[in-house]
């Protein structure tokens, strides 16, 4: 299935990988969001379980192995052809350039050699208190904070 101007939404998985008070971030190497910092993730492959998809995406983008602990958030990202701003409230008369249904998971790091690969231009561990310096989208910050709350409550 093509990612740009798709015929149907694409299921994507994201990983909020925590290691103590640090979180794993990647700088996107491809559209959409090329050049922006975010959590590791990508499109689910045909026949792949959600857990396997999360583990594969994190390993491909960062070299880190993870244990999936649970779902943090389910959301969608719909970007129209025109200006690239997300569509609020659903479909419009504008052609949809990207449409992802995103399932973000809380994950624990199991180790591995940190490196950036495949879809990532960079990867790093960031202290929770330094997140504001990475220009993360507000929804990403909200998902990360929710993941810390989930982890700390268990």
Name the predicted role of every residue range.
Residues 104, 115-147:
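NUDIX/MutT-family hydrolases
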Residues 1-14, 85, 95-97:
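Acidic, metal-coordinating catalytic segment for phosphate/diphosphate chemistry
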Residues 75-113:
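Active-site-adjacent beta-strand/loop module that shapes the phosphate/pyrophosphate-binding cleft
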Residues 32-35:
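A conserved beta-turn-beta hairpin within the catalytic core of GNAT-like acetyltransferases
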Residues 22, 30:
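Short, glycine/serine-rich, charged loops/turns that create anion-binding
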Residues 19, 27:
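A cytosolic small-molecule/anion-sensing beta-strand core signal
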Residues 39-72, 105:
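The catalytic Nudix box helix
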